[in-house]
Each structure stands twice: as structure tokens, then as C-alpha cells.
Amino acid sequence: VGCLTGQRVSDYKRINSKMIVTLTDGNKYIKLKQEKTGNIVYIPLDYRVAAILDKYNGTLPKVYDQKINDHIKEIGEALGWTEIVELDEQRGAMEYTAKKRFCDLLKTHTCRRSLATNMYKAGASLSSIMAITGHNSEQQLKTSLKLDESEKSMLAAKENYFTKLRIAK
């Protein structure tokens, strides 16, 4: 549900069928008031979220955040996302490089970033993504996007400036 709504765990755990509304475009949305910011967002209702809500009679099962994080890590491991990655960490004044399995770094907030990144890669504008995630500024949102340098360049190549130049193939 987190990867399909782009919400914080505190918000997507509260999603229920009473939040589903149909807007003037005829599509169904989840109308949600975010706990942290108080922002009201309208999230397009993905058929998979609808199926999950149907399965549980309109209310998601109650699960502790840590248990959700454990399941996300297990899924990452089952998918083979076990490569060792290095990250800079700090404890007090001491900085060091830690080595961890990629799957062990996955958590509920990864779901929120994944939706934002996937939407952006698919060509959604920052303002469209912000309307769903509830980020208050583009700068805030940009820190959530996980793109490597080649992905950033390929996205830039789709901008009007470059499409008018006709990039060599």
C-alpha cells in the first residue's frame, strides 16, 4: 500500500474504504488528511489497493511499524537484493563507512520514495507528485527522488530544450 500511495506509514495504515471518493473525472481517489502536515491529498485509487481493502472488508489489518519494516526487508531478501552497499554513518563526532546488505536498508519510507521516483521517471511533473505525496516544496520532494546520474541525464534529455535540438541516436 505504501508503494502505491506514496504516503507515510502513519497515513497509509489508516486508509480505509470510507476515504474513497469519486471526483468529477469519474475516477476513484483516496481522500486523506495527512497526520504530520494536515495536508489533504487525493491519491488515485490503484486497483491493487482497492483489492487489498476489499480483502480486509474496507480496513487494513493493524500491524506495528517495525513488523512492516521486517516484512519489507524479507521481501527485499527474497528478491535477491542482498548486495553489500557502503554508506557513510556518524556516531557522535566519529564518522565511518558501514557495509550493509541492500535489503536491510529497506523500510516503510522507502515505499514513499519509490512512488515519487517511479512517477518522476514516468514523466510526472514535480507538482503532480507533490499533489499526491503532500510534499510542501519541490526541494523537499527532490531529496526523496532516488535517481543516479545517468537517469537524471536521460530525464533532462526529454525536456523541450533537448527535444527541439534532436539528440543524435
Q: Where are the regions that the model predicts?
A:
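Conserved tyrosine-mediated DNA breakage-rejoining catalytic core shared by Y-recombinases
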Residues: 5, 14-52
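Alpha-helix N-cap/helix-start motif at helix boundaries, enriched for small hydrophobics
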Residues: 10-15, 129
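Catalytic-site neighborhood detector that most strongly recognizes the C-terminal catalytic loop/helix
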Residues: 34-38, 133-158
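Short, basic (Lys/Arg/His-rich) helix/loop patches that form interaction surfaces
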Residues: 58-62, 73-131
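C-terminal secondary-structure termini that scaffold catalytic or DNA-interacting sites
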Residues: 70, 81, 159-169
